[in-house]
Amino acid sequence: MYKNAVMALVLFAGLTLVSCNQGGSNNGGALKSSAAEKVFVAPGEYDSHYAFISGGFSGQLSVYGLPSGRLFKVIPVFSVDAEKAYGFNEETRDMLKTSHGYIPWGDSHHPDISQTNGVVDGRWVFINENNTPRIARVSLETYETAEIIEIPNSAGNHSSSFVTENTEYVVAGTRFSVPIPQRDISIKDYKGNFKAALSFIKVDPESGNMDLDFQVLMPGFDYDLSHPGRGKSHGWFFFSTYNTEEAHTLLEVNASQNDKDFIAAVNWKKAQEYIKQGKFKTMPAKYVHNVYSDETHSTISTTKKSVRVLDASKLPGLVYLMPTPKSPHGCDVDPSGEYIVGSGKLSASMTVHSFSKMLKAIENKEFDGEAYGIPILKFESTLAGTVEQPGLGPLHTEFDGKGNAYTTFFISSEVVKWKLGTWEVVDRKPTYYSVGHLMIPGGNSRKPFGKYLVAMNKITKDRYLPTGPEVTQSAQLYDISGEKMELLLDFPTVGEPHYAAGAPAEVVKGFSKKFFKLEENKHPYATKSEDDVRVVRDGKNVHVYMTAIRSHFAPDNIEGIKVGDRVYFHVTNLEQDYDVPHGISMIGANTSELLIMPGQTETFVWEPKQVGVWPFYCTDFCSALHQEMQGYVRVSPRNSNVKLSWSLDDE
C-alpha cells in the first residue's frame, strides 16, 4: 500500500512539471518596473553582494554579483578548464590527482564560506566533490583553487562541505555506505556489513591548509546533508539520514518504508577528547592531498596512508540519533543554534528539533532504543514544534536573522516563509520551476544578511529563449527585506547548482589580489628578466625559459628543435599591472592554451611530430599591437645537426 503511495507522489511531481505553462511564457508585466530598478547596477558601479554558486556536474564554482545576477567568473575546481589551462598546464595537473589516478571531472555541490565567531569572513570558500570524495578550498585572494584533499572511506561525498563557526573544521559525510575497509562482499549482504564515515577536516586558522583529523564510523545509512551547531550548540554537528532500512536496491521505494529516519547529532568536542585519550583506531587508508602554492605557482601532491577512526557504537556520548520524518533531506540550524530543521521529503509537515531539549533528553536518558549501539532519543523529547502543511517536498531551509525561516518545496515549486517559535507560515512565493536549494547571504551562519534570497531551480522549461534539448538551470532572486517576498530577477547559471554561499561585497572584495609580485615568484623555471631568457636541451627534453610583456615574447624565434623532442614552454608574465594577463598557444600542442596572470609562471608541453616552422601567439588581447605578439619555432629532422638557438629581434 505504501509503495503505491510513493509511486503516486512521484507521478504527481512528473505531471506537475509536464503541465508547466505549455503555451509558452507570458513576459508582459512579469516583473514590475520597481523590481527592475532594484536589480539595476549602473555602468561602473558594483553589486552589493557576492554569490558563489556551485556548478554540480560542471565540477566548478561560479561567482555572481547580486542583485544584478551578472556572472563574473567560473573558478575551475574539480574539472579541467581549457580557458584557464587548469588541469592542462604542468602546474595544476596534479590538483586533479587522486588515489584513483588523474580524474579530469568532478561533481561540485555545496560551497561554504569560512567563518569567524559564526560570521562569514570572506577568506576562503570550501566546496565538496560528490563522485570522487574530495573537499576543495578556494582562495578569495586569487579566486583560484588553493587545495584539494581526498576523503577516504567515503562514497558520494554529499553531506559536505560545511564549516564550524570558527572554521575549526570543514566536515564531509558520505551519501553511500560501503564496506569499510573495502572488500569483496555480496551487495545483498549490505545490512550490518556496510558502514559510513563522517570526516572532520581540520583547517589551519592562518593558511587555511586542511588536514584530515579523524573520522567517525557510523551505521550503514545514507547521510544526506549536514550543518554545524552554532552559538549554544557550537561543538556539535548534525547530519540528516535516509535509508535507515539499509536497502540496497530500488531505494525510491525500499528506502521509504520507515515512518522516521534520523538526524545524527555528533559531539565533535567529545570526539576531540576521545582523540586525546587515544581511543581511536588508526586505519590504513590511501588518499591524496594536493596544495597549490602562490609562491611557486605549482602544486605539491602528497599521498597519505592512514586515518584516525572513532567508532560511534563503542564511545558513549559521541553520537545521538533524533528520529525525524520522513527521509529528511535538509538539516539546517538557525542562527541561535537552538533549532535544527529536518525537511522530510515525504512528510506532510516539517520537524524542528530543540537543541536545549536534546541536551535535557540526553541528561535524563530519554531513549527509545538504539541503532548499532548508538542511543535513539525519544521523538517527543527533542521536538520543538512542527510546521504544518507548509508545502509538498520540503528540501532546504535558510534564515534571515529576523526570526524567519525560508524553505524550498520541490513538488509544489515554491519558497515558503515561516516563523521560528510559532511555526506559522507567513508567506509563500512560486518558483519556476521545482526549486532545489536556496541561499540567503550569511543564511548558514550566526549573522544572516537578510536582504536577498536566491532560489536555485531544477527545471527551467520556458523561462528563457530555447537552446535545444539542454536548457540552462534557472535561478531567481527575491527581495526578502519586507514582510512579503518579492521576485526581482531570473538569471541563468552554470552547470547544475546544488547550493550557494553569499556575503556582502564589503566582506569579501578587500582580499582580492591584483597581481603577483615578480620578486616573490619562486617557480623553479621563472624568468624575471628578458636578460635571462634561454633554451636548454636535456636529451629529448627542451626547456624554453620565456617571458611575455606588451607586446612580445622573448625569445620569439627558436631553432634547433627536433621531431620527437618534448618542449617545455615555461612562460613568465613580466607585467606588474592589474588586469594584464597574457596567453600563449602553439600549433599542434595537445594541451590547452596558457592564461598567465601578471607575475606568474606557467608551463605547457609541446611534442612536435612534423618538420617545419610552426607559429605561436598570444591568445589574450593585451594591447594595440596584440596581433604582433607572436613567434616561430623551427623543427628539424631527428638526425639533423641544427644548432639550438634563440633570439629576439635577431639578437
Q: Where are the model-predicted features located?
A:
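Bacterial N-terminal signal peptides that target proteins for export
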Residues: 1-7
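Predominantly soluble domains enriched in secretory-pathway, periplasmic, or organellar proteins
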Residues: 20-534
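Beta-strand-rich interaction surfaces with strong enrichment in secreted/lumenal proteins
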Residues: 318-319, 385-386, 556-559, 591-596, ...
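Bacterial N-terminal signal peptides
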Residues: 8-16
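N-terminal edge beta-strand
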Residues: 536-566
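Extracytoplasmic entry segments of secretory-pathway proteins
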Residues: 515-545, 639-651
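Extracellular/periplasmic metallocenter environments
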Residues: 533, 597-651
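Histidine- and aromatic-enriched segments that form or immediately flank copper-ligand environments
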Residues: 147-148, 570-604, 624-631
